[in-house]
Regions:
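Short hydrophobic/glycine-rich mini-motifs in sensory/regulatory modules
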Residues: 51, 115-117, 246
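The conserved cystathionine-beta-synthase
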Residues: 17-37, 42-43, 86-106, 111-113, ...
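Tandem CBS (Bateman) regulatory domains
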Residues: 1-14, 55-86, 98, 102, ...
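Short glycine-rich, polar/acidic loop-and-turn segments at beta strand-coil junctions
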Residues: 22, 43-45, 57, 61
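Conserved active-site beta-strand-loop modules that form the wall/rim of enzyme catalytic pockets
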Residues: 168-170, 182-183
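Short, solvent-exposed loop/turn segments that connect beta-strands within catalytic domains
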Residues: 45-51
């Protein structure tokens, strides 16, 4: 099935387009408000190189900076955190989009059509289980990933380093069936209240503890639940994941693991 037929909704969204000189504090506010994986940086359809900022690129750049310079980071132009976007034509097969995710290890891409374009992400694709466009004869336990956890008094800086090292977007709280995400961390540290504190003491930007953040309780499914059931309404949740006894289940697990195993059926 073609991308255009599988996920036509991607061209109906409205994205703010950042100028390369947009300050990081403004860019991050827009990223928080729109609750999406990335924002494009001033480009036009047809250009050979597409740039964007993502939560991952912003946080990884922040960790490279000394705490005393966190204030300077907020004033930097957003282009300093830019990453090159992978692009694909809307006329390509759905599997080609998934293979692009597999290659880049990022769960989003820029999809182009004549005169229009938009982001496609794994979050868009999990609903395809419900309408039968994709399917896999696997259960939740077959695709679950290990649960990594940290104490709730862990500061945000070390927590982010832990998440980046393991290439995970969620970390659970030790002793609790709750977790935080990279998106949740962005929403917290770049909120108005935290930025007011950081304006006076920039070095404290990442001093908050995980327990200070909004902790999320994942929906539980049985180990033997079908992937269709595990995927149910996952795209409606910004912090989408499920948990079973075998581990945590994310959109990547739901789609990419069956693909990698050669067990994902696509219409």
């Amino acid at each position: 099935m073609k991308i255009s037929k599988a996920i036509p909704s991607i061209f109906k969204r409205v994205y703010p387009v950042l100028e390369p000189s947009t300050q990081m504090v403004v860019a991050l506010s827009l990223l928080r408000f729109h609750e999406i994986d990335a924002l494009p940086i001033g480009f036009r359809t047809g250009e050979s190189k597409k740039l964007a900022i993502s939560g991952y690129s912003c946080l990884s750049r922040l960790l490279e900076i000394k705490p005393k310079d966190y204030g300077r980071f907020l004033e930097m132009p957003c282009e300093v955190t830019a990453v090159e976007l992978s692009t694909i034509d809307v006329g390509k097969e759905l599997e080609a989009l998934l293979r692009l995710f597999e290659k880049t290890k990022f769960g989003f891409s820029w999809v182009e059509s004549n005169g229009s374009a938009g982001f496609a992400s794994l979050r868009d694709l999990v609903d395809l289980y419900a309408n039968g466009i994709v399917g896999a004869k696997l259960s939740a336990k077959d695709v679950a990933s290990p649960v990594y956890s940290l104490p709730k008094n862990t500061k945000i800086g070390p927590a982010l380093k832990h998440m980046f090292k393991r290439r995970i977007r969620r970390t659970f709280i030790t002793g609790e069936e709750k977790f935080v995400t990279d998106r949740g961390i962005i929403s917290y540290i770049f909120s108005a209240s935290r930025l007011n504190v950081a304006a006076k003491k920039p070095h404290t930007l990442l001093d908050a503890k995980l327990g200070d953040l909004n902790l999320i309780k994942p929906i539980q499914v049985g180990d033997d639940a079908s992937l269709k059931d595990a995927a149910g309404a996952m795209s409606d949740s910004v912090e989408n994941c499920r948990i079973c006894k075998a581990g945590v289940i994310t959109p990547w697990d739901i789609l990419m693991k069956p693909l990698e195993q050669g067990k994902l059926a696509i219409k």
